[in-house]
A protein has these predicted regions:
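Signal-transmission coiled-coils
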Residues: 1-177, 188, 192-196
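ATP-lid-like helix-loop hinge signature
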Residues: 174, 187, 191, 204-242, ...
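Glycine-rich nucleotide-binding loop
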Residues: 234, 245, 294, 317-324, ...
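Glycine-rich acidic phosphate-binding loop
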Residues: 240-245, 259, 329
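Short adenine-binding "F-helix/F-box" segment of the Bergerat
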Residues: 248-255, 266-267
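A short beta-strand-to-loop micro-motif at the C-terminal edge of the catalytic HATPase_c
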Residues: 280-292, 314-320, 328
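Short alpha-helical Gxxx[C/S/T] motif in the catalytic ATP-binding
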Residues: 296, 300
Length: 339
């Protein structure tokens, strides 16, 4: 993606569109098959059936699209892609609701994890490809499609710190300060989109843990420290909080979908109105409330592994938690990942 570049005659757009025309129906067909292979009781869930119908309609529209022979047809294809992106924007929420409604009927946690890991990462890949093609029509400084050629980890962290602090202040009346250290001047080519999901999830978790472990002193809470480390192979973002750590009995469950320390009666849905409006303020549409749905951390973990990296949780019970997000560079110097 990074080295495809742009051609003056627009042939790069036709080439990209033709690739998507062949590739996207195949990927969507795999997702339809995986839904149909779910245990019968889950496949009958109305919310999951809604996702199934969305994928079937997308497959039909994409597979019936005519060959892309000129820029006019490519423009029509772009409009279809944008329509499908809009139609599918709530798929993660629907999956979360559908599995929460039906998971009690399935004893094997591995079935749920394997399905959601594959479905969510496949969805990320398809959205990245489609959004990249649409972005190739734009002329933004330091961008080739969705790839930022000079991404600053510090700046993207600061953006999501501001977002997470506003959420936290709304819920708790205050929010921890965040200090950023390490290789703060680092810049390199990378795709902001997955970071725009992962970082707010990790920051919200750290802020919630900090505030809830200091309920007696909500206006005197320890800082969260974010450290950036950059090298030739990858870059690491460590988020360290003093929120008391994760209890031993929960540590092996934090990567399970729907695991949450919040009681079910108080669980908040991702489309919560007030918090949803805050999400809209930063044009996200991807991030959910401070807690209670149990999807953020396992999804972030799946995304990081899909991108050739890792997400590791280190808990010091009684002190706090360190989370290490490690992602491979995409500059072509070392082995990276395939979208």
């Amino acid at each position: 993606m990074l080295y495809a570049g742009k051609s003056p005659d627009g042939s790069h757009l036709l080439k990209s569109a033709r690739y998507l025309l062949k590739e996207l129906p195949v990927r969507i067909a795999h997702r339809i098959k995986s839904i149909r292979n779910l245990p019968f009781i889950m496949g009958c869930n109305p919310t999951l059936l809604q996702v199934h119908e969305l994928y079937i309609r997308a497959f039909q529209k994409l597979s019936e699209f005519p060959p892309i022979k000129n820029s006019e047809v490519e423009g029509q294809y772009c409009r279809l892609l944008q329509q499908l992106l809009d139609d599918h924007k709530d798929v993660v929420t629907l999956l979360a609701e559908g599995f929460r409604e039906s998971r009690r009927h399935v004893k094997d946690e591995a079935v749920i994890r394997q399905f959601l890991d594959k479905t969510l990462t496949s969805r990320l890949g398809m959205r990245m490809l489609a959004t990249h093609h649409l972005a190739l029509h734009e002329d933004r400084p330091d961008f080739v499609g969705i790839i930022c050629t000079r991404l600053s980890p510090k700046k993207i962290i600061e953006k999501w710190v501001d977002f997470a602090r506003r959420l936290c202040e709304h819920k708790y009346g205050n929010a921890p300060r965040v200090r950023i250290s390490g290789h703060v001047a680092a810049r390199f080519p990378y795709i902001p989109m997955p970071l725009d999901y992962i970082l707010p999830e990790l920051l919200k978790n750290a802020m919630r843990a900090t505030m809830e472990s200091h309920l007696d002193t909500p206006y005197n809470v320890p800082d969260i420290v974010v450290t950036i480390a950059n090298n030739d192979v990858d870059f690491i973002i460590r988020i360290s909080d003093r929120g008391g750590g994760i209890p031993h009995k929960h540590l092996d469950k934090v990567m399970d979908y729907h695991f949450t320390t919040v009681e079910s009666s108080t669980q908040e849905l991702p489309n919560n109105t007030i918090l949803g409006n805050m999400v809209d303020m930063v044009n996200s549409g991807q991030s959910n409330p401070m807690h209670g749905f149990g999807f953020g951390l396992p999804t972030s973990h799946a995304y990081s592994e899909y991108l050739g990296g890792s997400l590791v949780v280190q808990s010091l019970q009684g002190i706090g938690t360190d989370i290490y997000l490690r992602l491979r560079h995409i500059d072509g110097k070392e082995e990276s990942f395939r979208i």
